[in-house]
Amino acid sequence: MGKHTSEHKNHAQIVQLLQDGQYFFHKGLKAYKERNLKRASKLIQRAVHLEPEDSEMLSQLAVIYSEMGQYQESNDLLDYIMANLEAEMPECHYFKANNFAHLGLFQEAYKEAAAYSDADPDGEFAEENDSLLDLLDLGDDGIEDSLYDQDELLVKQDRAKSLLESGQLAEAVAALEEITTEYPELWSAYNNLALAYFYSGNVVKAKQTAYEVLSHNEGNLHALCNLLVFYYYEREDEKVAELSDQLSNVYPMLLEQRYKLGATLALVGRYEIGYKWLKSLYKTGFEGDDTFFYWLSCSAYFTGHTDFAETIWRKVESQYPGEDRPAPWIERREALPSSVEQRLAAYYISSTKGETEHLEAVIRSKRITAPFETHFVKLLLNGDSAAADVSEDALFAYQTVKLLEQAEKEEMKTEVMSCWVFHVIQQIRAAAPLKNEKGWAAAICYIWKEAHGKQDTKKDTAARFGISPATLTKYMKYIDDILE
C-alpha cells in the first residue's frame, strides 16, 4: 500500500513537472545554447503557452526569432511585452533596434537604440547599443532621407494591400515585387506576394514564394499557413496532413497569428485546433470581420458546439445583411474543392448549360478564396460588360475560352477538353504575357485536335482565328515550352 502511494505521488510529481512552463523554458535554453534554434523556439513556445505572462520567456523567444531571421515576429513579441506586461523593459528597445536594422528600417532602428540609451545608459547592452548608434548616425541629411524612405515604404505597403483586397491582382503583384526587391528581408511583403500570385491562379509562383520565405525564415507562421492553403486547394492531401500536424503544435501569442492559424486549420478541416484559437480570440473581445466569424461558426459546429455556431452565424447575418449565403456547415458538407483547372472547367460548363443560379451561388460562397476565380465567374454571368471590374488574368482566360467556344463549341462542353484548356491557360498565366488571345486560342485548338486525330492544316486553323500561320506556329512553340 505504501509503495503504491509512493509511486502514485512520484507519478503526480512527474506530471506536475511536465506541466510546468519552467521545464520547457530550461529545455529551450539548453537547445538555444546548443544552437538548435528550431527546437529552442518550439520548446519556449510551449513554455509561453503554459505561462503566457512571463516576460523573460517571451523576450528570450523574441531573441531566438531574431536569430532565426524572423525580425518582424520578434518585434511583434517585444511590442506585446512592453504594451501588456512590462512597460519598463529597456532591453526590448535594443532588441527592436537590431531587428529594424536587419530589415533596413534604419530610422526606426535609430529611434529604438536611442530609447534604450535614454532608459538604461549603463545597461547590459550599452556598449553594443552605442556601436549601433554610431553605425546608424548618418547625420541630419541621412536621417531625413531614411525617414523619407520609410514613409515611402509604408505608402507602398498600404497601396499593395489595397490592390490585393480589391482584386487588382496584376497591379498588386507588381507593387509587391517592387517592395521585395527593395527590402529583401521584409517577409510580410513576400507573404502578401505569395497570396497575390495564388489569387491570380499562379499557384506555382505562389508556392515558390512561400518556399523562398521559409528557406530564409524557417518557421514563418504566415508562410506556413499560406503553403497549407495552397496544398489544400491543389488537393495535395499528404502534404496537407503533414503540414497541418506541424501547425497543430504551434502556440502563437499574438492575436493576428492566432487568427491566421485558427482560420487556416479550420479551412483544411482541423476543426478542434482551429476552434481553440478562434474561440480564444472571441473571448478576448477580438473585433473580427465576417471571415473571422465564418470560420469561428464553422469550427464550432463541427466540434459539437452547435448552439454557439448558430448564434455566431445569426450575428454574421445581422451584421452583414444581403449576403444571402448558406451557413458554413452546409457548404462544408460538400466535396472538397478540386484543382483550379477542374473548378474553372466546372464553372464554364455550368455557364454553357445556363446554370446561372449555380454560378451566382458560387459568387456568394466562401468556398472561393481567389479573386481570379470570382472574376472569371462574374464574366461568365455578365459577359464583357463586367470587363472593367475584373483582373487582367480573368479577362484573358474568359476571352481565350470564348474564342475556343466559337471554334469548337461542342468539344468545349466536354470535361476532358475544357479541363485541358484551363490547364494550359493556367500555365500561360504563370509563365507568359497575357496578350493576343487569338494566338493562344488558335495554338490550343490546333494542339488539341492534333492530339486527338482531328488535325486541320495550320493555314485553316489560323484563318479560323484570324491570324497568320506564322503566328500560330509561334504560339504553338510557346505552349510546347511552358508544358515541358
UniProtKB/Swiss-Prot annotation:
Entry keyword set: Repeat, TPR repeat
TPR repeats: 21-54, 55-88, 187-220
SUPFAM superfamilies (alphabetical): TPR-like
Cell inner membrane among keywords: no
Pfam families: TPR_16
PROSITE patterns: TPR (PS50005), TPR_REGION (PS50293)
Entry-linked InterPro entries: TPR-like_helical_dom_sf (IPR011990), TPR_rpt (IPR019734)
Protein name: TPR repeat-containing protein YvcD
Species of origin: Bacillus subtilis (strain 168)
